[in-house]
């Protein structure tokens, strides 16, 4: 009997030890999960205050493509502008999030974008999300979605640890604000809904409410000043110059040298949109005069202008050596290799 009792005691002790081990493992797992959640919730600020998320010329065209590192982030036109990624060879396409996406800014661990799920089809799951519009931050792996502003927003620019963006208020209308990438310190910079173009710690914009002059404003706020008078729209910055369209001259393309404040007319025809190579050597633009409509390229040194493809296109985006663009009616998308000017269909596979 004593031997049997010892065996029972040993079995009971082993059972208690096993339970304690399981309890310790569960506690450690919970601690690990909690630590991982805290780490993911913690905002990773940029060390470089000069960090940017996209070019002003891409943002002029809706910010549907952006690049960070070796990855291109884009709004897939064949999946209701859902957020996707691919490598720089236009392969390994992956869906990141189901939002209708525009004004993409990408840098480091994060992607910032404007959500417009009100434009989604009625059968889309994204239409039933908590908020159909707003400014959002998401990790590049598709996790950790964070709402930074919940009402409609439009163009946005990432600079360092701040986002300069147009936000809509039902009482005040469209205004220019600055917010931290953590969603804190949301500060109004301008009462008018100017589209911000940022370079050298300065915000450039064309007036909206009282004039269409070209203005500048410090990124820290203060009083804006006029740097060039006229009737301009479609502003962007490339390589020390501002590009814009002159509304007094039938929307012809112009360039303002910021060092001399000399304005040069680059085209003599009406254009609808444009994009500029990063070195300013070439401008790709859409002629919109009703007779010669098409995609053209301008050599800014020689002044030579060449039609690359006839038709009506928009959303011109330059990423590395590629120009992405779409049919005006959204029926097809294309990509052109800037080296040989060969145009192909761009039809990324749709993921569920």
Give residue spans per PLM region.
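A short beta-strand motif characteristic of beta-propeller blades
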Residues: 45-57, 91-97, 143-149, 184-189, ...
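N-terminal Sec-pathway targeting helices
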Residues: 9-30
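Repeated scaffold domains used in trafficking and secretory/extracellular systems
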Residues: 59-66, 99-108, 150-160, 190-200, ...
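Blade-level signature of beta-propeller repeat domains, shared across WD40, Kelch, NHL, RCC1
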Residues: 310-352
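Short loop/turn segments that connect beta-strands within beta-propeller blades
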Residues: 87-91, 139-143, 179-184, 217-222, ...
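Beta-strand-rich domains and repeat architectures in extracellular enzymes and scaffolds
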Residues: 50-83, 98-104
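A short loop-to-beta-strand structural motif that recurs across blades of beta-propeller domains
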Residues: 82-84, 134-136, 175-177, 213-215, ...
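Beta-strand C-termini and the immediately following turn/loop, strongest in propeller blades
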Residues: 68, 73-78, 107-131, 159-171, ...
């Amino acid at each position: 009997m004593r031997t049997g009792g010892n065996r029972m005691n040993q079995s009971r002790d082993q059972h208690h030890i096993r339970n304690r081990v399981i309890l310790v493992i569960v506690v450690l797992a919970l601690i690990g999960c909690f630590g991982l959640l805290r780490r993911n919730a913690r905002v990773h600020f940029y060390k470089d205050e000069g960090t940017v998320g996209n070019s002003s010329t891409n943002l002029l065209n809706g910010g549907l493509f952006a690049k960070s590192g070796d990855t291109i982030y884009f709004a897939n036109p064949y999946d209701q502008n859902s957020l996707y990624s691919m490598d720089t060879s236009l392969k390994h396409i992956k869906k990141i999030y189901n939002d209708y996406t525009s004004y993409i800014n990408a840098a480091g661990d994060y992607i910032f974008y404007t959500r417009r799920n009100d434009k989604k089809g009625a059968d889309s799951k994204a239409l039933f999300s908590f908020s159909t519009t707003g400014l959002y931050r998401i990790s590049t792996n598709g996790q950790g979605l964070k709402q930074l502003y919940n009402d409609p927003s439009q163009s946005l620019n990432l600079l360092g640890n701040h986002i300069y963006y147009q936000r809509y208020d039902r009482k005040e209308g469209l205004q220019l604000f600055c917010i931290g990438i953590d969603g804190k310190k949301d500060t109004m910079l301008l009462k008018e809904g100017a589209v911000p173009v940022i370079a050298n710690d300065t915000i450039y914009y064309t007036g909206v409410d009282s004039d269409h002059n070209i203005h500048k404003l410090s990124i820290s706020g203060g009083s804006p000043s006029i740097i060039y008078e006229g009737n301009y729209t479609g502003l962007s910055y490339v390589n020390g110059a501002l590009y814009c369209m002159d509304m007094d001259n039938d929307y012809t393309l112009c360039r303002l040298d910021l060092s001399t404040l000399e304005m040069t007319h680059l085209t003599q025809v009406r254009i609808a949109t444009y994009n500029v190579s990063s070195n300013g050597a070439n401008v790709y633009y859409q002629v919109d005069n009703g007779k010669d409509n098409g995609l053209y390229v301008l050599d800014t040194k020689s002044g030579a202008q060449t039609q690359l493809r006839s038709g009506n296109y928009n959303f011109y985006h330059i990423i590395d050596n590629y120009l992405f663009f779409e049919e005006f009616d959204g029926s097809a998308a294309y990509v052109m290799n800037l080296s040989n000017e060969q145009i192909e269909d761009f039809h990324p596979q749709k993921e569920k």
